[in-house]
Amino acid sequence: MTTHDRVRLQLQALEALLREHQHWRNDEPQPHQFNSTQPFFMDTMEPLEWLQWVLIPRMHDLLDNKQPLPGAFAVAPYYEMALATDHPQRALILAELEKLDALFADDAS
């Protein structure tokens, strides 16, 4: 299985987790919310919105078009800080993000 395949499976697992716990939204953010220059669109989106509307679709776009994946990639550290310590699915979300990050660490070595 290629790195692209493993990344796709992990993105699907992350999406399934967000859907299972009702963190997947049907209402798309306003167009101006995608114009952020901040990492993770901190100034225009909530952390889980960014996963749904930015990270997951952009990564799928790279995969679908057989483009190179980012060399340096780590989102879990941001989510360790961004998700409230009492968020009910914090540990589950962080675990899935750490698995995603590990795929890029493995690919870099």
Curated annotation (Swiss-Prot):
Biological processes, Gene Ontology terms: single-species biofilm formation
InterPro entries assigned: UCP006257, YqcC-like_dom, YqcC-like_sf
Top-rank lineage group of the source organism: Bacteria
Sequence intervals crossing the membrane: none
Family: To the N-terminal of E.carotovora exoenzyme regulation regulon ORF1. The C-terminal part is colinear with YqcB. To H.influenzae HI_1436.
Name of the protein in question: Uncharacterized protein YqcC
Name of the gene: yqcC
